[in-house]
Amino acid sequence: MTTHTYSSPLAHASDTDFRAWGLELSDALTTVGFPKSADTGQINWATANMPLTSNTAAGYEIRYLNDSLHGSKTIYLKIEYGTVNTSLQRMGIWVSAASATNGSGTLSGTTY
């Protein structure tokens, strides 16, 4: 199993900060074997803006476990990136899991 160490400071005060931590986390997930699906509408880290409202996601990625069971026991993760608390500049990450996706960012099938 591949591992990855995340060592960047987790600042969340600007669009630049949001893009930096989001992209690094996104890249780390790819490195450890959670590739992005081909779903449309996924977050673009070059242009994403930090939400200015609490409990708001700026976008999402659909990822899946790329292992020997992918064909028979598929698990998709929807990872939403955003802001939990604007006054404290806190980043937010929401994760949902299911057995399928509709190809445009909605999880379907069995949910976990």
What are these regions (language model features)?
Residues H4-Y112:
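Long, leucine/valine-rich, helix-dominated scaffolding and oligomerization segments
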